[in-house]
Amino acid sequence: MTGDNLVSAYVSDAERDVEASVRPRRLAEFIAQERVRDQLDLLLQGALRRGSPPDHILLSGPPGLGKTSLANIVAAELGTSIRVTSGPAIERSGDLAAILTSLGEGDVLFIDEIHRIARPAEELLYSAMEDFRVDVVVGKGPGATAIPLDVEPFTLVGATTRAGLLTGPMRDRFGFVAHLDFYSPADLETLLHRSARILGVPITGDGAVEISGRSRGTPRIANRLLRRVRDFAEVRADGVVTREAARAALLVYDVDALGLDRLDRQVLTALVDLFRGGPVGLSTLAVAVGEQPDTVEEVCEPFLVRAGLLARTPRGRVATEAAWRHLGRTPPNGIFGSDAPPASDLFSVEPDQP
């Protein structure tokens, strides 16, 4: 993975195996997300005592926070098999029917990016979730016949990064809905020490602190940065992941102290230097950094907005005072966000309790 997407929260095909090696296997091993963990434990323990599958589970939240890990943990805690697929892979209702009819009793079906499932397949899923049966249409036109097929009782675990795109009928069929939050630096440090033990990487406390602060509150990014710092430590240092090794390695990979990469800084620099902080339209900003508007909007902006470095306004994108200071510039008086808290405190605030 190149330095330009080292801090992407999405997983590449090349790193799936190594990511799986550090994935927690049981609920007790899952770090952070205490509320979700406790609620899920009650759901699963209750189902085990009754001897019946638990309600269908919907997990939402940004990528890289552990939705796939939790789906595998559900199957492990129940002692059943898991079948994994994704919304984009289910193009026809027949594809889904084949998967559903192959499930054993109590199995877990995990559908990642469930908001992208095709509408005919989604409608077929409704009856499977509620009545454990599907109607498969054979033939076309007036001669078409619907053949009912029974499905073994199962638990659907759906994962989505865009819960707002789920239809109402789909969302209503999940008995358990949970949202995963970004991790605090302390939780990421705990996770890094665990991953380092599994990978056999010597790491110091301040080394974990340095990496966690650049991980955007995302475990997937933290583990990826750990592997890159490990490479640096083994090749150019004494093999131990220290604060100094982490800083030197991430300087090579162009990841700064806030976790911004080259493209993130290009967006902020263009806003500040070319457009005097904005406001500027998305298309114009994308042209200025040589990227597609979708790339700027979907890859860069979510973290920049959350970090308090960029604001979306009705007139366009605006750099906040924190962005000016992060780039080492002096912000003009009266700039947008001049009263905003420092960006470095982004993930150190505990989430609000209900």
Swiss-Prot record:
InterPro entries: AAA+_ATPase, AAA_lid_4, DNA_helicase_Holl-junc_RuvB, P-loop_NTPase, RuvB-like_N, RuvB_C, WH-like_DNA-bd_sf, WH_DNA-bd_sf. GO terms for biological process: DNA recombination; DNA repair. Residues 330-354 are annotated as: Disordered. It comes from the Bacteria. CDD domains: AAA. It catalyses: ATP + H2O = ADP + phosphate + H(+). GO terms for cellular component: cytoplasm; Holliday junction resolvase complex. Belongs to the RuvB family. Homohexamer. Forms an RuvA(8)-RuvB(12)-Holliday junction (HJ) complex. HJ DNA is sandwiched between 2 RuvA tetramers; dsDNA enters through RuvA and exits via RuvB. An RuvB hexamer assembles on each DNA strand where it exits the tetramer. Each RuvB hexamer is contacted by two RuvA subunits (via domain III) on 2 adjacent RuvB subunits; this complex drives branch migration. In the full resolvosome a probable DNA-RuvA(4)-RuvB(12)-RuvC(2) complex forms which resolves the HJ. The RuvA-RuvB-RuvC complex processes Holliday junction (HJ) DNA during genetic recombination and DNA repair, while the RuvA-RuvB complex plays an important role in the rescue of blocked DNA replication forks via replication fork reversal (RFR). RuvA specifically binds to HJ cruciform DNA, conferring on it an open structure. The RuvB hexamer acts as an ATP-dependent pump, pulling dsDNA into and through the RuvAB complex. RuvB forms 2 homohexamers on either side of HJ DNA bound by 1 or 2 RuvA tetramers; 4 subunits per hexamer contact DNA at a time. This is Holliday junction branch migration complex subunit RuvB. It comes from Salinispora arenicola (strain CNS-205). The lineage of its organism: Bacteria, Bacillati, Actinomycetota, Actinomycetes, Micromonosporales.
